[in-house]
Structure formats: C-alpha cells, structure tokens
C-alpha cells in the first residue's frame, strides 16, 4: 500500500513538525592535524577588528599590545571592538537602578564563596595548559605540577588548601626574578639484547631542573594554549578554542562566580539555568511583552546573531565592569576580582604544534614548530598561509602571539551575559523616553530581542537604537544573520518558540543508543535517556516503547549478550547458555547475562539490578554483587553517576543516571603505549595520587568524610583518625589490647619519621 506522507501531517500543528527537519545524522566532523592556522586566524581577526586602537608595549614581556577601548566609533556596519568605557559604566548603573541592591548582594554571596572554596575546585575541567611542561594535561595533573613547582620555589601559602591562598602564591610567583621547574625528558640508548642478541632501543625517563627567568615565566603564566574545537556541525571551517593555565583559572572562577550570582537575579539571562527552567524563564519575558502590546501596539521579535562576539569583547571593559560592580566592597575582594581581566589584557596565545610539511618528490615529512614561524623563509608556504604569518609576525614571542584584545571562546560567559543584559535593560520606556521599547533574552553571545511600538516605523527606530547601543559596548549585531518575525515565532539557544517552546525531539536522537562505558552504566543511561525524553521532549508512550525495544536489541548486539535461549551464536553465547541452563529463575538474569528484558515505560526509573533482585537465584546475587571481585569498580560508587551526552546541537550535557556496582561495572584498562613515552613520569605521579587518595578514603569513608576544618595535612588527619577509631574499638571490646598498642606505636613511628624528614 502506498502511503502519502502528507497525510501524516494533517493532524499535526505545523510547529510540531520541526523534528522531521533534522539534518544531523551520522558523526559530526572532527579536526585532524594542528590548530596553528585556526589560532593565527583568530589572532589576526581580533587585531583587525580593533586596528584603529592604540599600540603599547608590555613593560615586563616586551609584547606589543593593541588597546581599542574608547577608540573611534565605526562609520560602517563592519564588526569592531571599540567599546566606550563611559557607556559601559552607565549601562551598569542603569542595570543597578532597575534592580536595587543586585550588585551588593551578589558581592556578599561571592565573598563567602571566595573564602570557602578549596583549591581542588581547579581539578574540575578537562584539558588544561600545563606551564611546567609547556603542553596540555588533565586539570588535576596540571594543578599538582603547579603546586609542586611553587613549593620547591618556597611558595607555601597553598598548603592551607584554600583557593585564595593558592592565588596568593600565583601573585607572588609573578614577582620572582626566576622560577625553577622540573622537566621530563626521554633518553634513548641502543643496547644489545642478551637473549636475542639483536640491537634494541632502551628508553629511560629523566627529570632535569630548568630555570625560567621572570620574562619567560610571565609569558608562560599568561599563556592560553589553543586547540581546535571538535564536533561542530553545520560549519565548513574549524575554529580554535583556548585552554588557560592554572595561574589564570582560579581568578576566572571567582569572576564567573560573581557574574553567575548576578545572572541568577536577571530575568533576561539565559544562564546559568538550563532545560525546562530556562524555557520557563524565557516564556515569562515573551508573555510580558505580548500582554503589554495591547491593541495599540505591534510586537516583533529578532532572532539575533552577533558577529564574532568573543573577538570584539575586551578584558579592559570587563575590568571596568568589575570595578563598578564591586565599588563599595573591601579592597582585598576588589583586587582579587580585577586580576583575571588584567591577566587577559596581557594574554599570549600559544600557536599550537606548528605546520606539517611534506615533499612528495623526496618522500619527506617534517614539522615546523610554532617557535620557528618568526624567522623561517616564507617561500615554502602557500599564499594564504604566507599572509597569515606575515600579519602575525610582529606579535610573536617564543612561539606565542601577543593577544591583548578579544576574549577567546568560553572564558567569561557569565560576565559577558551581564553586559548583554545591561543593553536589554535599557529598552524600558523610562530609558528610551519615546513610544518604542524593547526587552529580550541573552545567553552568552546568543540573543533574542522583542521590540514593541505603535507602528512599523517605531519598530525600525527601536531596532536601530538597539543596534547602535550595542556598538557602543563592543557588541556587533549581525544584520545579515539576524531576522525579524511577528512576536510568537523565534529561536533562542536552539529552542524554537512558536506560541510556546516546541519540543524538538530530533535534537536528542544522537544520545539514544549504547554509550559504550560499560554494561552496567550503558543499560542505565539508555533507559534514563528514554525516560528523560518522555518527561521533557514530548516522546509519546508508543514511540518510547519502540525506542526501548530498539535499545535492548542494540544493547544485546553491542555486548553480544543475546537471550540464553537464542539461536544466535557469538563468542559469548557459549558461556551465557551455560549460565542460562544452570539458573533456576531465568527472569532474574540481567540482560547482559542473557536474561529477558523486564523494562517497560512504567519502570524506567528503577535500576535493572533492583528491578530483578527478588527474582534472582541466591548464588547469582552473590556473584553479581561480590565486593571482592577484582573486576568491579567499587570506587565508593555514589548512588548517582554522571555521563556526558552529546546532543546534535549545543553544548555537551551532563546526565545523571542511577548506578549500582556489579560485576558489570568494569573499567577498561589503560592503553599501554603511554608507558614508553616521556609521559610515563606523569603516569607514575597519577598512580601515586590515586594510592594516596584510596588510602585516605579508607580512613574517611564517604559517610563520615567532612572537609577537615583547620589546616592539617592528609597524614596528620589519618593519624588522628586512626587513634580515635582505635580507642573506640578498644573500649568497646572490638580489638584486643595488643592490637591497640600496635596501632598507637605505628602512629607514633610515622610522626617521628615525618619530623626527621
């Protein structure tokens, strides 16, 4: 029978058909090779937007710096970064006037956070530029290396464990005439193998001390490393993103804490909330504008797009904003918040790995590191690359480019949102003093603008005024990419609004299926995704039931765990059949052990182990949840775990799922190839941290683990804990006198050894 596809839509309101327009099947594009070219593009573009600014030289590093602030106002529509200080300050003042006490209260909240935050806050986050090794590392390792170097240079404030004290060390380190660091390097030796008598290469890892003078250290401390942003859909060209080092991260964190606190109090801000909460917030603003545009007014909405938001923002402007926001606060607080923008005004962009060259005729491949770009002969490059290098050369120092204007992606999302909202706030009638007025939504660089006026001319005038106001603050609304509609239809941060937000279920499609973490997590994530989409994205019961069946099928094929009575033969089916035959209650077997699927759309919230627990054979229960099984990751599993989900569009989302530790929660082993590289030393450090942390957790099981108050080292904390526990156990008769004495003796010995060290 032929089905006419248009019949499917007869009963569907137009806005619900959005899910059928989904273009993103398949994998997103990933970048290969170096990001050097993209980074040079960013640096050159940023300088071009501010080219009529003033040039100065950094007295410490000698880096040339361009300052566009209060520069000439643009005469055309080209993007530019000439923000005017007085306009920014005035916008802040009006924002405060409309929200009395907002800055004061946010400062008080932030001050509390500043005094309580521990330095381990900086271990969150992924890749971080490690200035000691001059390349990227996981955040925790980069922090550990920084602290280790600080201590070996006599900077000890960080020992308190408070972030603010670590930042005190960062400040002191910048005044040092030199800093001594340890670098890892590799020695290769050719030796004859005793057994095979062949020559083999032996690798050993060496550590050597290396001194950085003040200038070199400052350059490293102010460096942002760059990488190419992966998995961006709908773009032909890749672009560069920045990973700042540990010196900058802590200061940025405090500024963003303040800005987040302000954003939470602003009804036009799309940050820091997300999901349904964000939709509710936005729907309120739209409702307000539509109810107020009675019969006398018309209302239009612009789905806005800004040209190169980050590259036209300026850290000097952020400094002005912070100075104003914190104007009545204690000196120490104002200082600590102003350091991040000051560091960003003096930032250096690391150009990445450099360029790959290959000569087809000579079959040669070679890498030109970024450090060589300053003085290499340019005739080897193609035209576009040659132009890039010529442009960037005056800015180069030691393979990094001086980049004073611009913000690099994703650094001050909250603070730049405050700046955007301050313009939306100026749309009230008491400020426009005319018949048109506006309001809107802002989330980092994305905005929606709602303009009300008595007639079309008024709408046009309102939009023009908004556009010009933005220019004064270094924001460039793109006339090409923004479009205007009758209020009631617009898009904001990938939410489509049409008389209410439309569920765009197809956005979630990429997160359906098997994640590939392990059998236990994958089952849990799979059903949670279906459950969440029933709650948030209009996934109907019939479709959900089908999604569930497809998921189970996919899961069984992925892990080769077809039902015990199946005819499909895989490497695993032999073992599964054996288990099936000797199990009395076959319904109790997990799907990953060849059992049946008991999930339906009513019980998706229950972890599979709990769902089947009462149906399991006793010996199966014992095997499944055996805490002594060496393959189980029993890292004090919290009842909630997080998985990173990649939707088709927009940022990666963190999704919570229930976790039950079983023999299926294995953790895949690390690839061994790292053991032969110069990173091996780092790996050994990592294992040492792991051991220390595991030991610490044995003394402080998560139930009793409160952050130690006062300043004591891990060892001191463990010793005092051991003594208390031993005394309680001895007095209640759980341990004998000899054991008690031995524990006490061991504790004293450890203390003695520490004193001698």
Swiss-Prot record:
UniProt domain RdRp catalytic: residue ranges: 286-483
Compartments where located: Host nucleus; Host cytoplasm
EC number: 2.7.7.48
Record has Phosphoprotein as a keyword: yes
Top EC class for this record: transferase
Keywords: Eukaryotic host gene expression shutoff by virus, Eukaryotic host transcription shutoff by virus, Host cytoplasm, Host gene expression shutoff by virus, Host nucleus, Host-virus interaction, Inhibition of host RNA polymerase II by virus, Nucleotide-binding, Nucleotidyltransferase, Phosphoprotein, RNA-directed RNA polymerase, Transferase, Viral RNA replication, Viral transcription
Region named Disordered: 53-82
Stretches for region Promoter-binding site: 249-256
Example GO biological process: symbiont-mediated suppression of host gene expression
Predominant cellular place of this UniProt entry's protein: host cell
Catalytic activity: RNA(n) + a ribonucleoside 5'-triphosphate = RNA(n+1) + diphosphate
GO molecular function: nucleotide binding; RNA binding; RNA-directed RNA polymerase activity
Processing and modification events after translation: Phosphorylated by host PRKCA.
GO cellular component: a single term: host cell nucleus
Purpose: RNA-dependent RNA polymerase which is responsible for replication and transcription of virus RNA segments. The transcription of viral mRNAs occurs by a unique mechanism called cap-snatching. 5' methylated caps of cellular mRNAs are cleaved after 10-13 nucleotides by PA. In turn, these short capped RNAs are used as primers by PB1 for transcription of viral mRNAs. During virus replication, PB1 initiates RNA synthesis and copy vRNA into complementary RNA (cRNA) which in turn serves as a template for the production of more vRNAs.
Subunit structure: Influenza RNA polymerase is composed of three subunits: PB1, PB2 and PA. Interacts (via N-terminus) with PA (via C-terminus). Interacts (via C-terminus) with PB2 (via N-terminus); this interaction is essential for transcription initiation. Interacts (via C-terminus) with human PKP2 (via N-terminus); the interaction competitively inhibits the interaction between the RNA polymerase subunits PB1 and PB2.
Family under the similarity heading: Belongs to the influenza viruses polymerase PB1 family.
Name by which UniProt lists this protein: RNA-directed RNA polymerase catalytic subunit
